[in-house]
Amino acid sequence: MKPPTTDEAFDTESYARYGGGQDLAEWRRANVNTLVQKVYAAVKAVKPEAVFGISPQGNNDNNYSQQYSDVALWLSTPGYVDYIMPQVYWGYNYTLQNGSARFAFENIVDEWLAMPRDDSVSLAFGLGAYRIGAGDGSATESGEWASGHNLADMARTLSVRGADGYALYRYASLYSGGEYAALMQAECAALAQANGIGQTEP
């Protein structure tokens, strides 16, 4: 859904014709909102029980200002989505070059969970399975992505925080072999334990 550019020249003609006096950014967001609403309505018209959702960037500032996606509106208002799943692919110790820890896992999860949300909309999180072994590019790399249980720790954190679930990007990364094969196996085992898979009731 991201436009090929944020340059004003991209949609000058359409904006001049249909902008209606709105600020350009507001007009673009309104168009995206209309698109999401119509897709949601079309899905429900064909199959009411189908679940429709969107997985935006974990950085909601970028969603709003660069992709013209008003995710806060979709979360708080019925008729846009059934769920939102932000792509939170950073670790617990992630820091930016300027030292900011805003996007460290727990911090950004709490930021999302604090957003107003309608009861009809679920909030789950996308976790970066592809980061295992390779790291997340943090300015202060901590080695957490080589622990063998980072995804499991995240799954537990989300459960404690009251999130509605999680998904892995990409699930296939856990079975890709290569230099991190043993680490991936450890992550799979830890995830299974965190999810109670293969355990029997006492």
Over which residues does each language-model region extend?
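Polysaccharide-binding and catalytic clefts of secreted carbohydrate-active enzymes
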Residues: 1-73, 77, 89-90
